[in-house]
Design a protein with these regions (language model features):
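Hot-dog-fold acyl-thioester-processing enzymes
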Residues: 1-82
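Hydrophobic beta-sheet segments that form the core/acyl-binding groove
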Residues: 82-114
Length: 114
């Protein structure tokens, strides 16, 4: 399967432009991310343990969400000319397997000096 990133230039994007991704979080994604990252913390991979410490189920890795953000930036907005230099994330609520999650990105400012 080929993946095609949008080829937006700075002239193609404007403040207020947005992109959105909604996905169904799967156990397979969580397992694959644990393998890729090496993060096998039982909060992420052991539902019984996560439940025993107060969560409804195993908790999705925060950086799995961050990876989805990276994919949205690099593939859609702005696309292949994007280089992510800084990212600040907060997780006010846990995300669990089988949840539907939506990420929405919006351009708030454009810096032409890069």
């Amino acid at each position: 399967m080929k993946h095609h990133a949008k080829d937006n230039t700075i002239a193609d994007v404007a403040v207020g432009d947005s992109a959105e991704l909604t996905w169904h979080v799967t156990h397979e994604e969580i397992s694959a991310f644990a393998a890729l990252s090496g993060d096998y913390n039982p909060l992420h991979v052991d539902p019984k343990y996560a439940f025993s410490v107060g969560f409804n189920a195993q908790v999705v890795h925060g950086f799995l969400v961050g990876a989805k953000i990276s994919g949205l930036l690099g593939m859609q907005l702005p696309g292949r000319r994007c280089l992510l230099l800084d990212q600040s994330l907060s997780y006010p609520n846990p995300l669990y397997p089988d949840d539907r999650a939506t990420i929405r990105l919006e351009i708030q400012s454009i810096h032409e000096d890069m």
